């Protein structure tokens, strides 16, 4: 067994850094000298810059895990366990999982075995054989989802590639625990688009129109949700990072190591006024529909010019309250509170002050969002393919939010 295994990290196909796994389980990250010296280098992560914008070049080793930026590229929870079980390894072995999945990760980053180092840390046949199928699960997150190609000339539908690499669509399968989740998300994302938010192209598809599903996904009912990937274009991959990566925290802390005020602060410093307004729209909308799962990984930055961040298009907008009785807390604190009902003009003013955002921009955007929601929701809720329980729950919940009542006056 080799004492050291090295993975090359590439950004837009160009080498930028290495991850070195030592025999004692430590992983060491280091930038390449050429990347450090390149004044026009593409941005890998805001978390790898100091408060003055300079590149950080010294990092501590991580024991038994990879650094947070890379840990957040890997699947979580049951999906990670499924992959690890198939490969015969422990779910905690992140370096090995990154070796398996690194050719098709979110954004424009890829991870490859260093030249002459094609074997994984433990050169086991089961791991080598599991790698091609594992790539089909290379999207980060908990929900069962795959990257897929759309069949424009073959009667429609989508195909999950046999070895997982490529694909400009995401297919999210029905939940085995909660009914109608794809339909719920389709409806909420559609409402958001009608309200003027930046939402990618999406559609509901019958399960029999999705080819290439791997074995072991279980018995599924309902439709799947297909979403066009905003990190893939005809010109190639576009780099993205979620806010767990931005803040340098591991996925396990996506609910407790940040808040919406902190996200707003980053957007105010790094992006545009339009992006700050879009952030407030999504935050208010998510509160009105009862989305209690907008944690750090459900907000992302995108790098259209490879260097400058912008708020990415919206994703994972759905109403969670129909599935969790009595749920009335957001995934993160707004500024002082997590209670959805307590989101008010005063709470947003506090958020704006602490995040150093324009209070007028924040409050005016919130008012406009509430007004648009009331109009669009009332006009469209019966035209969308969500369960009656979802619509009824939102009808009951939205008026409990203080902002909703304040702007109704």
From Swiss-Prot:
It is an enzyme of class 2 (transferase). The keyword Kinase applies. Its EC number is 2.-.-.-. GO terms for cellular component: cytosol. Signal peptide: none annotated. One of its GO terms (molecular function) is protein serine/threonine kinase activity. The active site is at residue 293. Keywords: Kinase, Plasmid, Transferase. The keyword Transferase applies. Belongs to the HipA Ser/Thr kinase family. NCBIfam families: couple_hipA. This is Putative kinase Y4dM. It comes from Sinorhizobium fredii (strain NBRC 101917 / NGR234). The lineage of its organism: Bacteria, Pseudomonadati, Pseudomonadota, Alphaproteobacteria, Hyphomicrobiales.
């Amino acid at each position: 067994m080799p004492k050291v295994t090295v993975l090359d990290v590439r950004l837009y196909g160009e080498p930028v850094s290495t991850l070195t796994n030592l025999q004692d389980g430590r992983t060491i990250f280091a930038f390449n000298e050429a990347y450090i010296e390149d004044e026009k280098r593409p941005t890998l992560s805001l978390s790898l810059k100091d408060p003055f914008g300079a590149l950080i070049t010294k990092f501590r080793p991580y024991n038994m895990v990879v650094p947070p930026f890379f840990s957040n590229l890997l699947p979580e929870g049951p999906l990670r366990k499924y992959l690890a079980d198939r490969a015969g390894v422990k779910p905690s072995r992140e370096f090995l999982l990154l070796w398996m999945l690194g050719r098709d990760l979110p954004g424009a980053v890829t991870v490859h075995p260093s030249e002459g180092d094609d074997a994984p840390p433990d050169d086991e046949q089961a791991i080598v054989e599991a790698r091609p199928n594992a790539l089909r699960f290379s999207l980060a997150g908990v929900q069962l989802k795959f990257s897929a190609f759309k069949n424009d000339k073959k009667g429609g539908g989508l195909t999950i590639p046999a070895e997982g690499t490529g694909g400009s669509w995401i297919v999210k399968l029905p939940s085995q625990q909660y009914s109608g989740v794809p339909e719920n998300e389709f409806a909420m994302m559609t409402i958001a688009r009608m309200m003027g938010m930046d939402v990618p192209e999406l559609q509901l598809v019958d399960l029999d129109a999705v080819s290439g599903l791997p074995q072991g996904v279980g018995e599924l009912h309902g439709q799947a949700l297909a979403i066009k990937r905003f990190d893939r274009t005809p010109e190639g991959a576009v780099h993205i990072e979620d806010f767990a990566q931005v803040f340098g925290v591991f996925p396990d802390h996506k609910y407790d190591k940040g808040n919406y005020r902190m996200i707003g602060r980053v957007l105010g410093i790094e992006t545009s006024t339009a992006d700050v307004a879009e952030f407030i729209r999504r935050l208010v909308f998510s509160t009105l529909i009862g989305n209690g799962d907008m944690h750090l990984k459900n907000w992302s930055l995108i790098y259209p010019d490879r260097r400058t961040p912008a708020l990415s298009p919206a994703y994972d907008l759905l109403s969670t309250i129909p599935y969790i009785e009595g749920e009335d807390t957001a995934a993160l604190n707004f500024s002082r509170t997590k209670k959805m009902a307590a989101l008010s003009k005063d709470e947003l003013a506090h958020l704006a002050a602490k995040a150093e955002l324009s209070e007028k921009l924040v409050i005016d955007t919130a008012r406009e969002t509430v007004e648009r929601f009331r109009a669009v929701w009332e006009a469209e809720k019966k035209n969308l393919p969500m369960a009656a329980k979802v619509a009824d729950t939102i009808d009951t919940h939205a008026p409990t939010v203080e902002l909703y009542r304040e702007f109704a006056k």
